């Protein structure tokens, strides 16, 4: 993982550790948004992985889609 990707993964790791147990595991997509973010950052680095993560988080809302949404290759 690149240094930028590692830095961008810190808020995701904090969310998983602190907030996720409180808000529950109710993501509309599979894999969950945090799992998607970690995979995108690991696979594509900080810039593209960060962009993919941002797009995914913006799609994850009550009126958004559902289903399987894997990280593109």
Swiss-Prot record:
UniProt similarity note: Belongs to the UPF0161 family.
Protein name: Putative membrane protein insertion efficiency factor
Pfam family, one: YidD
Gene Ontology cellular component list: plasma membrane
Role noted for this protein: Could be involved in insertion of integral membrane proteins into the membrane.
Main location: membrane
Annotated localization: Cell inner membrane
Topological category with respect to the lipid bilayer: Peripheral membrane protein
Keyword Membrane: yes
Keyword tags: Cell inner membrane, Cell membrane, Membrane
